[in-house]
Amino acid sequence: MKTIKGPAVFLAQFVDKKAPFNSLEGMCKWAADLGYKGIQIPTWESFLIDLDKAAESQDYCDELIGKVGSYGLEITELSTHLQGQLVAVHPAYDLMFDNFAPDKLKKNPKGRTEWAIDTVKKAAVASRRLGLKAHATFSGALLWHTWHPWPQAPKGLVEMGFEELAKRWLPILDVFDENGVDVCYEIHPGEDLHDGITFERFLKATKNHKRVNILYDPSHFILQQLDYITYIDHYHEFIKS
C-alpha cells in the first residue's frame, strides 16, 4: 500500500474532438480538477504524445514530464493497447482491426503486424526516457475464436497458437527488458490473455520472461464470471499496472 499515490485515469476513454478533450493541456486540467494524480497516455493519439519523438529525444520527454507535472499530475504509463492488439490478429478479425492501423497499412496484414511490433518497441524506449517502469498493452489474439468448446479444436492447435504469440512478442519483450520496463498485458475478453490460465500459458510459452506481467482491470471480470478478488491472491506478483 505504500506505493499508492492516488487515483489515475486512462485518457483514451475520454478523448473527443471537443475541448477540453482534444488537447493534452485540456485533458490534464480536466483530470487534475477532478482530483486525479496520474494519467495513462494512449500513444496512438498524436495530440497527446509524439511516440516517434519520445523514443528519440530526451529533451522532448523532459518537456512532456514538465508539462504534465505543471498540473500536479504524473504520467503513470504509456499505453499501446491498439498497437499491441495488432501484433497478433486472426484473419477472421482483419476487417475489424484494420481500423486500428494507419491508412497506408489497411488491407496489409503483414505490414500492419510489422508496424505494430516496431511501434510497441518504440514505446519501450519512450517509457524509459519518461522514467516509467510499466507499460500497458493488449496481447492480441490468434486463438480467441477457439475459446468455446464447439467446434472442438484440433489437437495441438492451442499450443501452436501460444507458441506463435510468444514468437511475436519475445523480441518486443527483450527490448522492454533492455529498457528496464515491464510489459503489463490487460486481461481482457477478445485477447489471448483473457484469464489466469491463458496468462500462465503465455508466460510458459515465453519461457517465463521476466517482463511478462499483468494490467489488472477488474471491470470485465464480473461479466466473465471471474472472481476478481481471488485473482489478486493468485497473480499479485505479476500485477504491475
PLM region spans:
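Short, glycine/acidic-enriched loop or turn micro-motifs at the edges of active sites
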Residues: T43, P189, H220
